[in-house]
């Protein structure tokens, strides 16, 4: 199946967890993103507020490990949080500071 799974989101880096490394030495950074916006749904304005766990791998993980409190624009895909949890986690493929 070739379903799309693409996420683009502007959010605040609410929390940054300590960086860790895979057995292969790849940096892994888990963060919590906080988003708030007004969206139109069924012709009505709707306030959307959410927090979502996210993960950054590789060189970008090291670059963002001290950036808590920064607004960012991220692009990535949703995946299960772990082998034992089907809760969603945003896997970030591209992250940049949000300039508004």
Curated annotation (Swiss-Prot):
GO BP annotations, alphabetical order: DNA replication, synthesis of primer
MF terms (GO), sorted A to Z: single-stranded DNA binding
Domain SSB: 1-99
The keyword Metal-binding is annotated on this UniProt entry: no
GO cellular component assignments: primosome complex
Subunit structure of this chain's protein: Homodimer. Interacts with PriA and DnaT. Component of the replication restart primosome. Primosome assembly occurs via a 'hand-off' mechanism. PriA binds to replication forks, subsequently PriB then DnaT bind; DnaT then displaces ssDNA to generate the helicase loading substrate.
Protein name: Replication restart protein PriB
Originating organism: Neisseria meningitidis serogroup B (strain ATCC BAA-335 / MC58)
């Amino acid at each position: 199946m070739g379903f799309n799974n693409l996420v683009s989101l502007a959010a605040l880096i609410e929390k940054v967890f300590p960086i860790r490394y895979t057995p292969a030495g790849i940096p892994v950074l888990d963060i919590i993103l906080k988003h708030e916006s007004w969206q139109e749904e069924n012709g009505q304005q709707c306030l959307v507020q959410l927090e979502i766990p996210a993960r950054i791998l590789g060189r970008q993980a090291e670059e963002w490990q001290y950036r808590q409190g920064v607004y960012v624009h991220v692009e990535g895909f949703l995946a299960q949080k772990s082998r034992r949890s089907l809760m969603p986690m945003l896997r970030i493929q591209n992250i940049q500071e949000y300039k508004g």
